[in-house]
Amino acid sequence: MALRLPALLDANAPWGPPSTVPEDLKFDDVPYAPFSKGDKLGKVADWAAETKDGKDQKRTQFGKNFRDPYHAYGASSASFFTNEDAEELSSFSVVDNAKNANKPRGTATVLKTRGGAPRGGSFAGRGGSQRGGRFQNQPGRGPVGGQRGPNPRFGKSKFGWRDFDKPQRIRNASVDITDDWTEIQEITYSEMQKLSYDVAQGVEIDTYGDLFPYDRKFDRTNNITKLAHLGRTVFNTTTSEDPIMQELAKDPANRIFITDTILSQIMCTTKSVAPWDIVITKKGEQLFFDKREGGPLDFITVDENAADPPADSTDKDNINSSANLGFEATLINQNFASNAITEDPKSKVSYKANPFSNNDSNVLCHAYKYKKFNLSDDPEGAPLNLILRTEVDALGPDGTTLNLRVLNEYGSSEWKNKFNTGRGAIIAAELKHNLNKISRWTVQSILGDVDQMKIGFASRVSPKDNTQHNIIGVVSREPKQFAEQINVNLNNGWGIFKSVVNIATAKDDGKYVLVKDPNNPAVKIYKPAAGF
């Protein structure tokens, strides 16, 4: 077969390519290599550069001496034209027949927290559930450091490293909200934290009841005292049923009526977690704030702010359920108030007759102080008087007044061994787990002009018996100083309450319910159905 040379084109010029390119010589279906403006000019190839691709995610490319960013495209892309047969690769596998060395038994796996150290918490007190790598003692949840028994890092103990994956606890509202209820407004905690309102010192109207001196034997160290059940009658009358409030309501200048139990909860709303509700009744120009009989405000919460609070349970035999613990804490506080006073008739201080008792000798001695606050925005204008009922529990030295409160331990009995040496750690743990409750106690004491708070620490005689308790010790706190220590801002509390008052004042006459959202940091105001 003869070799035929292709015909040469006539050159119009002796130098350079022809002005037209034949069709058979034009480039067709030739891959185009994308380029990058970051490519260095003059570098044809860098054979010493390390090949990187999208699979290399372990190294950071932004180190101290980082200069030339690597581009996954352009001239420096080493695998752009690489053709890999997916089917061939999928049928290929490598078998590793090397034997893995067994770890020697007894080698502990160290659970590290972020930063290489625990983020907080202590071993004192009840503590909280182990979260984030810190071990703390929670009743019924295994041993703790320093406690005899198996090492909590082995066996069935939980590290808590998958606590983030636990389903969130769903609570029910404290009141049954039906479809015929109308939601009026929602206020979130973030909005409440920005509120502030300055209220002048209240004016005392009158005081009712009796007071006995405080028994100072409870202040002694190493003095574990059995808490006796004296069975005193305790009155917790709501606002609208208070005969003194009813008498003061006859004055049209008095516009708002409330008790310290209810007001302290509203002022400490942003610290509350457990659900609660308050009934607001508008009658003309007057507002009455009431609690429901047998509702959440009749009982004291336990470990409300803990990371793993007591579970809600309908089992009456579960003494550590939230409901049973609340009932237990309420009884302990009532018994402590009757145990920690010296009932000497010669030392008794009497005010006006107790408005709630009919000369019952078994009534727990209390003093009820009624005060007036002006919530008007214009101090020189018409007053917006708030009538508040506060309580005082006992007398201190030199005629000072005291409030008596108790924190209770359940599930274990560590306080009696650690209270004298680890008192600070126990108090810090209680502040963490019961912040709302302690904040409310502090606000109540400030509103009632109480000079000192006596906070007792009660522990069960037996962890499985919730009827017998010992008072391990008592600490004293000055309310205003204590409020600063635990970050209780009264101006913020007054701002929250004033906002609720403004909302209720603008509505028509009737009943409204202020409800703490059980699962979100917010409160809602509802217009309930008729007949509520």
From Swiss-Prot:
Renumbered to this chain, the Gly residues biased-composition regions fall at 117-131
Q: One Pfam family for this entry, by name?
A: eIF-3_zeta
Annotated region (RNA gate) at 296-310
* Major location category of this protein: cytoplasm
One Gene Ontology cellular component term attached to this UniProt record is:
eukaryotic translation initiation factor 3 complex
- Single Gene Ontology BP annotation: formation of cytoplasmic translation initiation complex
Which InterPro entries does this entry report, sorted A to Z?
Answer: eIF3d
Q: What GO molecular functions are on record for this protein?
A: mRNA cap binding; translation initiation factor activity
Top-rank taxon: Eukaryota
This protein's domain notes? The RNA gate region regulates mRNA cap recognition to prevent promiscuous mRNA-binding before assembly of eif3d into the full eukaryotic translation initiation factor 3 (eIF-3) complex.
Q: What is this protein called?
A: Eukaryotic translation initiation factor 3 subunit D
The species this protein belongs to is: Yarrowia lipolytica (strain CLIB 122 / E 150)
